[in-house]
Amino acid sequence: MTEPGGLLNVIDVEATCWEGQPPPGAVSEIIEIGLTVVDLGTGERVEKHRLLVAPARSAVSPFCTELTGLTQEDAAAGVGFTEACRILAARHRAGERPWASWGDYDRHQFTRQCRATGTTYPFGHRHTNAKAVFTDAHGLRKRPGMAQALRVAGLPLEGRHHRGEDDAWNIAALILGLVERGAWPDLSAPRRQPPPPGSPRRVV
């Protein structure tokens, strides 16, 4: 089912991290989910959301606080990861709307953490790697970070870099620039999944 207006969820996550190796037994976990809703029909960023997520198997390090601005107290006040995924599905229609992120890190982190916790993956199959689309559209040799991409596009960095809600907002601005260039892929219909290996192919 496709929503009227062509809404797109832009997602950016921040996770527990360390300068060097993680402490024994600790794993990187999502502590913030930034979400901006883009109306591809009107070319506007229409909603900005933030979910804080309490880590269960790690703690926010001083290095992580310096990078993201989030403290252990901030993260501990958040919802559990499973509840965060439920909110994404229930309030933001994550399973129905197409979604995008800057690179594939966010998608892979959700996949890993859902598998590790037995949580239902909240998103549908229509994911777009905005970094890859931007790189191709601007003819760049290397895929840029978000801040560099904003400079290439001549756009300001709004808010704080490595804050999920602000990064999602800025990524959404880059996506709207790609829409204006006619470079953003058509997400109005679900993508066909490739057939299983060995399946007969239809000859057209």
Residue spans for each PLM region:
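A charged, well-structured terminal subsegment
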Residues: R160-G177
